[in-house]
Amino acid sequence: MAHLLEKTRKITSILKRSEEQLQEELPYNDITRQLAEIMDCNACIVNSKGRLLGYFMRYKTNNDRVEAFYQTKMFPDDYIRSANLIYDTEANLPVEHELSIFPVETQSDFPDGLTTIAPIHVSGIRLGSLIIWRNDEKFDNDDLVLVEISSTVVGIQLLNFQREEDEKNIRRRTAVTMAVNTLSYSELRAVSAILGELNGNEGHLTASVIADRIGITRSVIVNALRKLESAGIIESRSLGMKGTYLKVLIPDVFEEIKKRDY
């Protein structure tokens, strides 16, 4: 009991960590590392859309195909759809189970591998799943108590993360709207033409060519780009005779310009 209490305190202490420790790309790597070390297993956290938020591997279990999921930071759609249907913790799933984290081609290497999946709910909202697994040791009752506590702790952190993401999105959209509102009619036409030249969110363009094509002066394009760049919506770099390299930092600008019908 004392050992369980000590582990419980370690898990709940995760809530006291500073938000500055979150990494942008995999914001919960540190949390999964702590959980994996406390429970002596591998662990990962995925949201309800399959995005990998963090993982930590204490033991090698994967092959190149599965490692690719960690590189792309997305889990297969079929797996996530099935995982999202779980409303209570599913413990010690064998390698043959559809929700086993062990890939089919490695089942013979880890015949005793066991997967436990705990849904992450906060205020009735499904935010994702906490997945832990071991090569050959069963998760006992103490482990499952820790899993339930862990999923609650992670849920609180995910809710905070989601709230911060929502606030960031609102700030980004507001910045785009305010910047676009400062553009003149000609500058709006210029921005629309410029965005149409890009290959996705970045590309090379020649201001004089665009200016001639839509019947405006080059200075209009320069002014429009300067306004967007000062608002943090784009970044640009002169390529000399080759034109200008442009990268869109806030993609919401595409939709905002489209709404203006330019």
Curated annotation (Swiss-Prot):
InterPro entries (alphabetical): ArsR-like_HTH (IPR011991), CodY (IPR014154), GAF-like_dom_sf (IPR029016), GTP_trans_reg_CodY_C (IPR013198), Transc_reg_CodY_N (IPR010312), WH-like_DNA-bd_sf (IPR036388), WH_DNA-bd_sf (IPR036390)
DNA-binding region (UniProt annotation): 207-226
GO molecular function: DNA binding; DNA-binding transcription factor activity; GTP binding
Major location category of this protein: cytoplasm
CDD domains for the chain: HTH_ARSR
Signal peptide extent: none
Annotated stretches, region: GAF domain: 1-159
Keywords: Cytoplasm, DNA-binding, Repressor, Transcription, Transcription regulation
Similarity annotation: Belongs to the CodY family.
Name under which the protein is recorded: Global transcriptional regulator CodY
The species this protein was found in: Streptococcus gordonii (strain Challis / ATCC 35105 / BCRC 15272 / CH1 / DL1 / V288)
